């Protein structure tokens, strides 16, 4: 919890991804280390920003080790970074 509000780089294996058109804002979730709801960290991409990616983020980052840069926030006791651009994410390796 000490890193909330800090601009940082977080890296980890993407355990599962999902694009939720049925939720307000059409979010894409990239969950690190463990699948939802046991993830240790989440990258959130809002639907309004998906067109900035050349490929669907939930497919691009699935089964990859990824680093994301941004401000760490807390949502329902889970840490996350909201990614607005592909420049915030780097694929480190395939799992």
Predicted features along the sequence, with ranges:
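OB-fold single-stranded nucleic acid-binding module
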Residues: 1-95
């Amino acid at each position: 919890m000490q890193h909330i509000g800090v601009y940082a780089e977080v890296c980890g294996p993407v355990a599962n991804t999902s694009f939720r058109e049925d939720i307000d804002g059409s979010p894409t979730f990239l969950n690190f280390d463990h699948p939802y709801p046991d993830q240790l960290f989440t990258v959130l991409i809002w639907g309004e920003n998906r067109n900035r990616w050349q490929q669907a983020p939930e497919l691009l980052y699935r089964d990859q080790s990824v680093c994301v840069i941004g401000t760490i926030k807390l949502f329902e006791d889970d840490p996350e970074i909201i990614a607005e651009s592909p420049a915030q994410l780097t694929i480190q390796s395939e799992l």
